[in-house]
């Protein structure tokens, strides 16, 4: 028992059913092999200190998440479901993760407590001698007379909950009279989700948050969910910085999937998102494939119109996002929409495209395998994760690897019984033992010199007789 070493990565693999359940709660699906690849091969290259064996350090997870969610070509939309699930494991750990969670995150919450005593000084300026003119204005009471004469509108504005916009540390020199009246009336309102979207790249993420702060559905200061639609700048940036669905369905599908996960949009938001990023024909194809993915009570795909319309309606449903039932409907709807995007993005079988995927000179075998699997998903109807397709993927991996790696893989003993994982490990070993460019130049130079020595003409000794 004491000889086995448990790492965060091995721990998640031992509890893979729980990991899949947690991912499902985040409205995403994760695959075990991609989980291992991203943790051990991809995220360590982000230069944030991510170990190859994984970690539950929340700071490192947040740094990797920032890299994954980076806009434009520097982002990794295909890795969003995996880092979101890692984050959920660390911030809301199940019992088998709690012993491994770093105890460092609680201290970042402490600075927020000392910030509370900063509020009383805000109420002192009205009593300060620096503002003597404010005292008579309060005693004269001109405002109550105006409010009573004007009737309801202004009274309603003052009695309603304040809008959810944060006053970011206002200087005490301006409008202290207004803040002095608003502060005792209630607590400071929550920050605006719309402002949070605009500040997202400047402010670090909150330590106790498990997901992105850019939510259309957000709990406001009165404890009720508040709705914030997509901004036009968000939609414009998503459309202009990504290829069309017909050109690269995988990339746009990954983008929409990440938006559905982080923003948790309503039914109307989903229609707006699809209408902006897809053409009319592409949208109809996605909706058709999503309705095909609806399953009945027996867990199998159903074609009953009432069940299909109940799960994936084409007309605006009466799902209230303020109720748990309405939110459950929206989660299921978004899952079906992701399935529709994935199925609609599959092109007709084109094995020539798959054969055209070859390993780059400096590309790791793990990264090459991911590109190869993506080609299978995009250009064939086959699932590369299906055990029945492992032989085909293995042969493609051998034949399309770099020449030096492919030759050594073909010479392996008992090649027929080697699994794809065995081939990848052997390819990684060969890749890591490759000679550097300097070593290669030195070897070529030595071989050239040896060849010249072997082919140099052997001249007989000439004895010169010099006569006196």
Swiss-Prot record:
Chain ranges passing through the membrane: none
Site entry: Cleavage: 131-132, 215-216
Stretch forming the signal peptide: none
MF terms (GO), sorted A to Z: RNA binding; structural constituent of virion
Disulphide bond pairs: none
Positions of the UniProt region annotated as Disordered: 111-222, 434-455
Keyword Lipoprotein in record: yes
Entry GO CC: host cell plasma membrane; membrane; viral nucleocapsid
Keywords: Capsid protein, Host cell membrane, Host membrane, Host-virus interaction, Lipoprotein, Membrane, Myristate, RNA-binding, Viral budding, Viral budding via the host ESCRT complexes, Viral matrix protein, Viral nucleoprotein, Viral release from host cell, Virion
Short sequence motif PPXY motif: positions: 162-165
InterPro entries tied to this protein: G_retro_matrix (IPR000840), G_retro_matrix_sf (IPR036946), Gag_p12 (IPR002079), Gag_P30 (IPR003036), Retrov_capsid_N (IPR008919), Retroviral_Gag-Pol_poly (IPR050462), Retrovr_matrix (IPR010999)
Listed Gene3D superfamilies: Gamma-retroviral matrix domain, Human Immunodeficiency Virus Type 1 Capsid Protein
Biased composition (Basic and acidic residues): 163-178
Motif segment (LYPX(n)L motif): 130-134
Additional observations: This protein is probably translated as a Gag-Mos polyprotein.
Name of the featured protein: Gag polyprotein
Protein's organism: Moloney murine sarcoma virus (strain ts110) (MoMSV)
């Amino acid at each position: 028992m004491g000889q086995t070493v448990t790492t965060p990565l091995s721990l998640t693999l031992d509890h893979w059913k729980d990991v899949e359940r947690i991912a499902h709660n985040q409205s995403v699906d994760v695959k075990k092999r991609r989980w291992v690849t991203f943790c051990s091969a991809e995220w360590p290259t982000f230069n944030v200190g991510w170990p190859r064996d994984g970690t539950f350090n929340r700071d490192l997870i947040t740094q990797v998440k920032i890299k994954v969610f980076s806009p434009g070509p520097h982002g990794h939309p295909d890795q969003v479901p995996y880092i979101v699930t890692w984050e959920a494991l660390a911030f809301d750990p199940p019992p088998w993760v709690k012993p491994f969670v770093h105890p460092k995150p609680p201290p970042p919450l402490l600075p927020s407590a000392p910030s509370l005593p900063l509020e009383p000084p805000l109420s002192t300026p009205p009593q300060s001698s620096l503002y003597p003119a404010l005292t008579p204005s309060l005693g004269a009471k001109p405002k109550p007379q105006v409010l009573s004469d004007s009737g309801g509108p202004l009274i309603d504005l003052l009695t309603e909950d304040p809008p959810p916009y944060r006053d970011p540390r206002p200087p005490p020199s301006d409008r202290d009279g207004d803040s002095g009246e608003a502060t005792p009336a209630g607590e400071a309102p929550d920050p605006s989700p719309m402002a949070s979207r605009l500040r997202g790249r400047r402010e670090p993420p909150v330590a106790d948050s498990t997901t992105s702060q850019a939510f259309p559905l957000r709990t406001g200061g009165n404890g009720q969910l508040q709705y914030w639609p997509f901004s036009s700048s968000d939609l414009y940036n998503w459309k202009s910085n990504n290829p069309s669905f017909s050109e690269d369905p995988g990339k746009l599908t990954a983008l929409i999937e990440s938006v559905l996960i982080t923003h948790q949009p309503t039914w109307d938001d989903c229609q707006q998102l699809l209408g902006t990023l897809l053409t009319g024909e592409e949208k109809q194809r996605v909706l058709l494939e999503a309705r095909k993915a609806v399953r009945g009570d027996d867990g199998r795909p159903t074609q009953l119109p009432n069940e299909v319309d109940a799960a994936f309606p084409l007309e605006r449903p009466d799902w209230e996002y303020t109720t748990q039932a309405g939110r459950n409907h929206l989660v299921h709807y978004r899952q079906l929409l992701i399935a529709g995007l994935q199925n609609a993005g599959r092109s007709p079988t084109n094995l020539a495209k798959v054969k055209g995927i070859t390993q780059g000179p400096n590309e790791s075998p793990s990264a090459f395998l991911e590109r190869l699997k993506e080609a299978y998903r995009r250009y064939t109807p086959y699932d590369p994760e299906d055990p029945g397709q492992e032989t085909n993927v293995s042969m493609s991996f051998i034949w399309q690897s770099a020449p030096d790696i492919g030759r050594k893989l073909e010479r392996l003993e008992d090649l027929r019984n080697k699994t794809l994982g065995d081939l990848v490990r052997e390819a990684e070993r060969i890749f890591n033992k490759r000679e550097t460019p300097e070593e290669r130049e030195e070897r070529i130079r030595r071989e050239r010199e040896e060849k010249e020595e072997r082919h140099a003409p052997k001249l007989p000794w000439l004895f010169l007789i010099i006569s006196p």
